[in-house]
């Protein structure tokens, strides 16, 4: 005689299985238990790693199988998974900051041209820069929407000039359109 497993997980021959309220092992579907989502493959094994479902991508922790929600560093790259565990691509606002995730889900760092506009994403955090930024041994100014500034710009009551192609702030004396900078 044996004990029927119900609404619990059990390790058999090195694989974790989940048994539902009727004692049947779950296969090929998501289960929520321990306040987290898990996926069990067609053989009933707990699933780990990347999971693609249609146009949505998920990641299940390699150590415990939990679906990731929030920021996660995977193989040296940062990703973001929304409240449903779906991997972010494109623009994402969280932690009171803007970020941009590439088509493969990896966080963007440094200068990036997106939809025809140049942005700068801080090297350590990936946060979109606004206001003054010093990088590549130059000074730049990014508008509130993150766009790099070009040409003449009055900032805090002072006029500045930013190169028309590179956005680099002019240093030393420079005259443009009747203004001396």
Locate each region found by the language model.
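Extracellular adhesion/carbohydrate-binding repeat motifs centered on closely spaced tryptophans
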Residues: 1-181
């Amino acid at each position: 005689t044996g004990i029927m497993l119900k609404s619990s997980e059990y390790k058999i021959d090195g694989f974790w299985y989940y048994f539902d309220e009727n004692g049947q092992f779950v296969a090929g579907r998501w289960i929520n238990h321990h306040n987290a989502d898990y996926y069990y493959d067609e053989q009933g094994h707990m699933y780990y790693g990347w999971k693609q479902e249609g146009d949505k991508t998920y990641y299940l922790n390699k150590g415990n199988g939990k679906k990731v929600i929030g920021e996660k560093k995977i193989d040296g790259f940062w990703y973001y998974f929304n409240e449903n565990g779906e991997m972010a691509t494109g623009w994402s606002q969280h932690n009171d900051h803007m970020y941009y995730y590439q088509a493969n889900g990896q966080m963007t760092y440094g200068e990036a041209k997106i939809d025809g506009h140049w942005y700068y994403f801080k090297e350590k955090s990936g946060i979109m820069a606004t206001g003054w930024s010093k990088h590549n041994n130059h000074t730049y100014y990014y508008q509130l929407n993150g766009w790099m500034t070009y040409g003449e710009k009055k900032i805090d009551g002072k006029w500045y000039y930013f190169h028309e192609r590179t956005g680099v702030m002019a240093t030393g004396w420079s005259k443009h359109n009747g203004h001396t900078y």
